[in-house]
Amino acid sequence: MKEKYILSIDEGTTSTRAIIFDHNGNEIVSAQKEITQYFPEPGWVEHDANEIWMAVQTTIANAFIQSGIWPGQIAAIGITNQRETAVVWDKDTGKPIYHAIVWQSRQTTDLAEKLKKDGYSNLIREKTGLIVDPYFSATKIRWILDHVPGAQEKAEQGKLLFGTIDSWLVWKLTDGQKHVTDYTNASRTMLFNIHTLKWDKEILNLLNIPEKMLPEVRSNSEVYGTTASYMFFGGEVSIAGMAGDQQAALFGQLALKPGMVKNTYGTGAFIVMNTGDKPTTSNNNLLTTIGYGINGKITYALEGSIFVAGSAIQWLRDSMKLIKNAPDSEKAAYESTSENEVYVVPAFTGLGAPYWDAEARGAIFGVTRGTTDKDMIKATLQSLAYQTRDVVDTMQKDSGIDIPALRVDGGASNNNYLMQFQADILGKKIERTKVLETTSMGAAFLAGLAVGYWKNIDELKHVFTIGQAFEPKMGDLERKKLYDGWQRAIKATRVFAHGE
């Protein structure tokens, strides 16, 4: 009998990947395709949902071809995805009626501000765990219904469907047979009540979004359906695990005990803390969200979302032309001779947690005649670590838990300079996993558990391993001095955006 594997579809903000894992958690093959970014107006970010679907098909086919594995050897498919990004499509034709509005996009700022001014912030916070912000799906759906002629009427007639990217992909993979999402993705829409685990009728009425547009909400580990018979060279494969990218990473890191924290350095950086079976309300602008729901039990989490992380390194490469590829940033940072007096605040699309300032824009401080390109690169890398500390400090305040270590993953966690500086500025141990793609691994774990590929979570503990740890080396006085400088830079950035 041929060996069985798990296929993870990892649909991210800048690219789509298909990764095949074996029973020991080894990555057998990874196929990747970049996604076109559309910027119709300043601050707007959109994707073509059809292009995303084509990229998923291409990467899956390439993974099979490169590995020699055939669909009959796939025990299950797990899906993980960029969250909040909103797709609205025609139920009959299966065609999107507008581009997918991406989580980073600020085109619905006016709608979010109106909700705040009308006094709905507390209601929405209490029900969804989220703050009112253009980041989440709700205002994106409202924007599409407002700006596409006839869309509201069609939605009310049940002719339009909404989904986050997971929902869109399951719809396409099952040839329109299943319109479902999972607890984690639903909890990021600003429409889902995280206490009742249902779409919230009061918020839907407030935004005039018909509930019939919305997908059925399911757990993170169960069989949702099978792929259509004409796909994957004729093999029908169970789709059995789904989670938004950051919750998938939390599960992939096996951060399954209250107080465990992970940071994924992707396009943005996302720090998530397991808070157990009761939601923890933040007094400092962190998000209360669903970590995962399996076997009839919900685990909640606190999250701090940083909008710009890996995309700051892309900015160095693509816009500033200071590096040719991302790994060059590590070498440049080590070669910089500056005393860390330069600060880059990469608020290209506003500031995320704990500030939630949609109007802030990027700024650079402390530049002298002697500042070099390497100093700028180093300061940009350091900005990821400073922003992470902003969130970790806030999590400790909200939870009352002293976080002993931070588990890290994602592309930028491969940068040794950044990881050491992260340990130094936090004064905490950094644990980098052996498999950096824990987002895909988490989706694989969820799918594998659903079909018995792995018997239970104890079996997963033998699969997961820490690759390298970074201990803090910086003294307390130096740490305080550098972080004080960062806080001044943040304050000045916000003053510039808003005036005194």
From Swiss-Prot:
Binding, ATP: 13-15, 267, 310, 314, 411
Enzyme class: transferase
GO CC, one annotated term: cytosol
Pathways involved: Polyol metabolism; glycerol degradation via glycerol kinase pathway; sn-glycerol 3-phosphate from glycerol: step 1/1
Keywords, sorted A to Z: ATP-binding, Glycerol metabolism, Kinase, Nucleotide-binding, Transferase
SUPFAM superfamilies reported for this sequence: Actin-like ATPase domain
Subunit structure: Homotetramer and homodimer (in equilibrium).
Protein name: Glycerol kinase
Gene: glpK
